[in-house]
């Protein structure tokens, strides 16, 4: 069974590699985005996709307003189930860049969804990271106010 290297990585997650995919288990009470970012950095993943499920106790969503080109962030502190976390991996300024969205279920069976800024795991966290083995870069597009794929880089 493969494990992440170094004390920092071992505290955040464990994993098993199958082909070009990694099955990643994130440790309880770990911030999910930071753990996935550290994992991709450790493995040298330059592009790929991420999906997963689990449980969280805190969530910060981000919503983009295209008219103002500004983000509105909102934090929720309650137990929630991740029904879907999905996103992609690329790089920007030679750093890992994760673009993640999440849908969570609340105890009243309503749902929240949006761009994932951060989430603190409170229970299991099971993710699949696929490595595309190619570099995909991003660049800032001032017309959109967003970091978008740049296939020329």
What positions do the PLM features span?
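Single conserved hydrophobic/aromatic residue that forms the stacking wall/gate
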Residues: 1-9
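N-terminal intrinsically disordered, cationic/polar leader segments
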Residues: 10-99, 103-153
């Amino acid at each position: 069974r493969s494990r992440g290297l170094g004390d920092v990585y071992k505290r955040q997650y464990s994993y098993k590699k199958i082909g070009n995919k990694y099955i990643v288990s994130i440790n309880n009470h770990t911030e999910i985005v930071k753990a996935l970012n550290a994992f991709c950095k450790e493995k040298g993943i330059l592009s790929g996709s991420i999906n997963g499920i689990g449980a969280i106790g805190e969530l910060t969503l981000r919503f983009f307003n295209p008219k103002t080109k500004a983000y509105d962030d909102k934090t929720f502190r309650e137990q929630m189930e991740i029904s879907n976390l999905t996103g992609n991996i690329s790089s920007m300024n030679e750093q890992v860049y994760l673009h993640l969205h999440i849908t969570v279920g609340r105890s009243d069976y309503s749902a929240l969804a949006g761009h994932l800024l951060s989430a603190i795991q409170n229970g299991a966290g099971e993710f699949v990271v696929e490595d595309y083995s190619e570099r995909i870069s991003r660049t800032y597009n001032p017309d959109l106010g967003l970091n978008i794929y740049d296939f020329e880089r």
